[in-house]
């Protein structure tokens, strides 16, 4: 099997952008929207999917505006979940995952990403003892704000056509009027329940990273921050290329996408509590309770 590398981080931590940047170098075999949407469909083609996207008026992801195309790098969690498995890898889903690796095997290193596996990386390390891991981090307040924004966007009045193509579960939930009503109500920010739910997940995943990242040998892991990637994309990508022994990086095409906006009120009210709960993570990654990041850190 070709060398295997996982990009891991919280949802909305910058995994998509990092995956795009690395995919555009042409040095990796990556999973794409075409693979996910047409998985198991004989005779499918990127051109046919491109026409379908055009006919349905799907040009960008609702949550963040990322342009959609058959070649957009995507997460393997959808294939797992569409076949009845959890969104993260388990012993039961390894055979299906092996099929994904077989499809992607073209001689280049295989690069995959799945935020769901950020809190389950010890299993990946055990299941794939030669795999390497690229962890990307972002200030938790920004992660939570962005994740809540995406949740609210995909459960707004209009179905997210792109997510519906990717996820059978989303289609099923949307088709149930009662379920759709509940999620839409949560997406209004009622009682701040969506913020609390997302905050709990982010806190738990980051604490897991603090407690377990050192169990991975240093030769198998590298971490970077979204903030540093925005400030110096070429420098941070070169760190990854050096880590993977791939030489100099090609020229970049995807521009930086730093996003700044005032925190939503329901999140602002929780920042002190969150920074206290994640004090170890803040210290490890150089994040401050005021929502800023200390100067560049490399680990």
List where the protein language model places each region.
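PAPS-dependent sulfotransferases, especially Golgi type II membrane carbohydrate sulfotransferases
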Residues: 1, 148, 155-299
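Conserved phosphate-donor/acceptor-positioning beta-strand/loop module used by diverse small-molecule
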Residues: 113-115, 124-149
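Short catalytic-loop micro-motif centered on adjacent basic/acidic residues
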Residues: 109-113, 223-225
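PAPS-dependent sulfation machinery
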Residues: 34-111, 177-183
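Hydrophobic anchor at the beta1->P-loop junction of P-loop NTPases
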Residues: 7
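P-loop (Walker A) phosphate-binding loop of NTP-binding proteins
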Residues: 10
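A short acidic, amphipathic alpha-helical/loop segment
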Residues: 17, 120-127
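A conserved segment at the C-terminal end of the G1
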Residues: 16-29
